[in-house]
């Protein structure tokens, strides 16, 4: 039996594939109807994570992830290990920021660099909660009710 380690589910750009519904559907069948409603093809489920398919994600518009290709060409595990870090591929964007964690990439890269991938995985639930539910407080960053 081939066991996937959680750190193998961290993409080079630091998106955690192990927290994605496309991956989680393998253990959570209740997600399947929701994913199908959003246009995901049944034969594309579950997604094994980007490292398992060498960045050839069926859920991307172009087929292969440019960030994955770049990391592979530069021979780095994570983008922060690259001499060109940070680059525009990791630049935050407001587009779909309310539903996708893409704007976490820079923070995640810095966190992995300083604390390691295992600590990043442990911190992810708080990071996602702070990103999706936090309220900006000038000079303090995103705040949660329990921070007050």
Language-model features: where?
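Cysteine-centered metal-binding/redox modules
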Residues: 1-148
């Amino acid at each position: 039996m081939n066991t996937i380690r959680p750190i193998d589910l961290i993409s080079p750009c630091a998106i955690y594939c192990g927290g994605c519904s496309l991956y989680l559907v393998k253990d959570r069948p209740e997600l399947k109807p929701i994913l199908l409603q959003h246009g995901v093809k049944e034969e594309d489920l579950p997604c094994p994570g980007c490292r398992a398919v060498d960045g050839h994600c069926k859920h991307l518009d172009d087929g292969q992830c440019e960030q994955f290709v770049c990391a592979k060409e530069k021979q780095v595990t994570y983008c922060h290990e690259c001499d060109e870090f940070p680059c525009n591929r990791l630049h935050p964007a407001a587009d779909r920021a309310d539903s996708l964690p893409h704007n976490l990439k820079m923070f995640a890269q810095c966190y992995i660099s300083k604390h390691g991938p295992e600590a990043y995985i442990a911190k992810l639930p708080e990071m996602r909660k702070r990103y999706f539910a936090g309220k900006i407080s000038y000079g303090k960053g995103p705040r949660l009710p329990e921070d007050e």
